[in-house]
Amino acid sequence: MLLVGLTGGIGAGKSTVSELLADLGACIVDADEIARQLQSAGSPVLVKMVERFGEAILNGDGSLNRAGVAEIVFGSDDASKAALKDLNGIVHPAMQAEIMRQIKLGHDGGQHVVLDFPLLAENPRDDLDATIVVDIDPETAVDRLVNIRGMDETDARNRIANQASREKRLAIASHVVDNSGDVDALRTQVEDVWGQITG
């Protein structure tokens, strides 16, 4: 059974590609979803985050205020960069353990596993059989984030700037999916790439 990495910058359409791969029979291990689960109210990870960043990162019900954390870690100053490093140091060890557990479940079930991991270029893995990068022009990504997700343009640009560069993501790719077209064109590319990987 194969282990395939899937990554792409924010706004690139990685989630759509992930859904298409699931439709093709892949077991999806979603790092963002794992992070959300690990940061649920009262979890050990969230407790450590509060110790580092203060109770201002919590909503009234004790859940994580993601926008509050984003304001702290996605700025362009040195304090924001240090905060992002600290956040990753808290979240990533717990994430890695859960990712490995889910990969094993998928393989034990006889499925090829796709690790949907936005930070794959920043945190390379040597256990991948292939890596799919969903690529899009950064200005198109900003446009999608602002017009589809309702994000502030400055926030969108800061988030993109805090991710690996487009060039760094493309450098780790064994396969590239260009998501500048429509969903039908994307589906065709995903089917072709999946066939190449699993064929």
Placement of each model-derived feature along the sequence:
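Walker A (P-loop) phosphate-binding motif
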Residues: 1-26, 31-33
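Amphipathic alpha-helical segments that mediate coupling or scaffolding at interfaces
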Residues: 9, 52, 72, 90, ...
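An amphipathic alpha-helix signature
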Residues: 24, 46-50, 138-146, 153, ...
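Well-ordered beta-strand positions
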Residues: 27, 33, 130, 174-175
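ATP-dependent small-molecule kinase phosphotransfer cores
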Residues: 33-111
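Short, acidic/turn-prone active-site loops that include or flank metal/cofactor-
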Residues: 33-36, 137-139, 161, 183
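ATP-dependent NMP and nucleoside kinases share a basic, alpha-helical "lid"
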Residues: 100-108, 112-148
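Small-molecule kinase domains that catalyze NTP-dependent phosphoryl transfer to phosphate-bearing small molecules
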Residues: 126-127, 147, 151-199
